[in-house]
């Protein structure tokens, strides 16, 4: 949470320290463009890695594949930027991509930490990354008023954390040697492709109603909606921090045949996400107007009524992410694909109906309805998978996961 807060404060300081909004707009553009291709650079390998309970792949192979996807996504990102952005924005986009790339490399090392149940290493790393990159950005931008120089400072700060903290801690468990065969690269590309497409579909669920809102009501309405939505993002992030550390435990329980333990952990996780949502809804009901006024000024207060529907839609998104990731850990990539694609298809008609009827609130209603449709599909597949048990997992990965769980159980 510290890391995300520091990243968010970067967007605040670029406005506070500059004399206009040009650099803020350029930073927002770089974030948006890089975000499009970040999904392909990530290639959903984090969830796959931490649920690799038999250790079929080495950290070097995961790292090699991450470098491969980072390089490929960078080429695509820069081609897209060259076609859609002003020439002076290209360097900023490239630098911000490099900065985010360091974080994606660190994520692979965090996977090793999580597999070995050292979540404290991950927490310390995120704190170091967040604080160091924010301080680097503020100091350099304040001194130079040069956005590119400030992003370079963030890149250097993140790299220092990578080499001085994360790499040494990871190598306490496993030596990191980058390696990737053609066969392994093709295996990763093929296996995780449905999850990547599903992730792209999920990322578009709210983009569609937002774009329609801007088209029909105006960009000012979208700006208001996005500003009010900022505090509610804590629900999505809180949910990820809640279930993320459990994504290696779920497959162990499942492939060991411990259905009762699996169901109990699932129930606790769902209850936890609901609890975070309810707590945030109550807190923001009382301090939402004050928090929004503090962040964006008094002009935003009349739109505080948008907050509760946003909370509902954010919670629905969190459940879509959770059940999708859970099915990936159980090696049901196509089930995850189906749920997210259904959500994407559902949001299209819902967008026209909801935004036309409720304006800004329509974005929340359309997104929530689409996510809940996707969640229903994901739950259908999850119940089906759990009822059939691990013996019905199809494919080499399913067999490997079953064998790994048995080996781990016998070793204990």
Features from the language model and the residues they span:
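Hydrophobic alpha-helical transmembrane segments
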Residues: 90-99, 123-172, 191, 229, ...
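Membrane-water interface segments that mark the loop-to-transmembrane alpha-helix transition
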Residues: 1-3, 30, 36-83, 91, ...
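Interfacial segments at transmembrane-helix termini and the short loops linking adjacent helices
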Residues: 18-24, 82-96, 219, 286-315
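Helix-loop interface residues and adjacent transmembrane-helix termini in multi-pass membrane transporters
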Residues: 18-21, 86, 116, 143-144, ...
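Helix-loop junctions and terminal segments of transmembrane helices
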Residues: 38-57, 115, 228, 232-257, ...
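Transmembrane helical elements of multi-pass membrane transporters/channels
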Residues: 1-11, 128-129, 133, 150-165, ...
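Interhelical loop/hinge segments that connect adjacent transmembrane helices in multipass membrane
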Residues: 120-125, 147-154, 163-206, 249, ...
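Membrane-interface junctions at transmembrane-helix termini in multi-pass inner-membrane proteins
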Residues: 47-57, 102-126, 312-341
């Amino acid at each position: 949470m510290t890391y995300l807060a520091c990243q968010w404060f970067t967007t605040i300081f670029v406005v506070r320290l500059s004399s206009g909004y040009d650099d803020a707009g350029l930073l927002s553009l770089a974030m948006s463009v890089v975000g499009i291709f970040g999904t392909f650079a990530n290639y959903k390998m984090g969830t796959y890695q931490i649920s690799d309970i038999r250790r079929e792949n080495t950290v070097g192979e995961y790292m090699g594949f991450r470098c491969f996807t980072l390089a490929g996504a960078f080429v695509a990102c820069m081609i897209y930027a060259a076609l859609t952005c002003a020439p002076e924005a290209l360097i900023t986009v490239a630098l911000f991509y490099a900065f985010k790339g360091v974080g994606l490399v660190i994520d692979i090392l965090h996977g090793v930490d999580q597999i070995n149940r050292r979540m404290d290493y991950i927490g310390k790393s995120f704190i170091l990354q967040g604080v160091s990159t924010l301080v680097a950005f503020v100091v350099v931008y304040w001194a130079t008023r040069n956005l590119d120089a400030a992003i370079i400072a963030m890149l250097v700060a993140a790299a220092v954390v990578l080499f001085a903290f994360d790499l040494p801690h990871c190598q306490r468990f496993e030596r990191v040697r980058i390696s990737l065969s053609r066969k392994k690269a093709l295996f990763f590309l093929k296996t995780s492709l449905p999850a990547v497409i599903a992730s792209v579909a999920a990322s578009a669920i709210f983009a569609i109603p937002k774009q329609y809102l801007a088209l029909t009501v105006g960009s000012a309405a979208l700006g208001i909606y996005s500003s009010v939505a900022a505090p509610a993002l804590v629900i999505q992030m809180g949910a990820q921090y809640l279930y993320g550390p459990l994504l290696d435990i779920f497959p162990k329980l499942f492939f060991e045949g411990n259905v009762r333990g699996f169901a109990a952990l699932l129930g606790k996780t769902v209850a936890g996400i609901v609890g975070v949502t309810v707590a945030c809804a109550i807190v923001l009901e009382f301090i939402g107007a004050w928090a929004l006024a503090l962040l964006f000024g008094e002009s935003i207060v009349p739109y505080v009524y948008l907050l509760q529907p946003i909370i509902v839609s954010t919670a629905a998104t969190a459940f879509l992410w959770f059940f999708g990731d859970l099915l990936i850990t159980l090696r049901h990539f196509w089930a995850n694909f189906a749920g997210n694609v259904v959500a994407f298809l559902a949001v299209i008609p819902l967008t026209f109906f909801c935004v036309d009827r409720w304006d800004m609130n329509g974005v929340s209603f359309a997104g929530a309805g689409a996510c809940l449709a996707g969640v229903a599909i994901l739950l259908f597949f999850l119940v089906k998978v759990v009822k059939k048990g691990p013996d019905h997992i199809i494919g080499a990965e399913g067999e490997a996961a079953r064998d790994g769980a048995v080996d781990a159980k016998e070793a204990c």
